[in-house]
Amino acid sequence: MNIEKKTFVNEDEKNIFQEQKEALKSIFEKLDMSKIAFVGGIADYLNLRSYYDMPVNDIDIIYENEVDLLPIQEQYGIRKYCTRFYSMEAGEVLVSEYPFNNKKIHADYYKRNFSRIKLTQSPLLGKMVWHASFTEMKEFHNKQVPLITSQAMGANYEWKRLYKHSKKASLYNNVCYLEEKNLLQTLKNNL
């Protein structure tokens, strides 16, 4: 486990931008990590880093109780926005900004019932964190693609959003395909 953890720390150092590392460091220090979980780009990174060399582009976090975000609210402030892209329980996203070298790194917080999402734990920058599982994120990206096409979205269509979900769905689907192919080859060799 220590060798694997060290390898992942090296991977994390390489694939996570310095600004995001600083924001994550603040999150690790301020929040109870047992009361939040990562989704979005960080969950994708954690689920796929053994297969692909991919950067982390955003920080998306789910929580059950807004009171658990108070340490962030008190130090950095949190603003509420309506979310039109994802069907969420509260219909809103909370956003905090972490200043670093004249830049602001955004973290998005979504209210979710943890019992309705498959979570798992993995090391991130040497800390164990909860995040959406491989299966959960694969299903999410595959379900998002038909919902965000130009035909489905009309005037709200964003090609970058469709591209992002299509690409991530393909990465997850490819991993599953390769694992199934390897399993079939192993079975064939054992017969």
Residue spans of the language-model regions?
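Helical scaffold of the NTase/Pol beta-like nucleotidyltransferase catalytic core
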Residues: 1-39, 46, 180-191
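Catalytic cores of NTP-dependent nucleotidyl/adenyl transfer enzymes across multiple folds
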Residues: 3-7, 102-191
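Active-site nucleotide-donor binding segment shared across nucleotidyl transfer reactions
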Residues: 24-59, 64-70
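A generic structural signal for short, non-catalytic loop/turn and secondary-structure boundary residues
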Residues: 31, 54, 100-102, 124
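General structural signal for secondary-structure boundaries
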Residues: 40, 62-68, 98, 133-136, ...
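Short amphipathic alpha-helices in soluble, non-transmembrane regions
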Residues: 69-77
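Conserved catalytic core of two-metal-ion nucleotidyltransferases
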Residues: 76-120
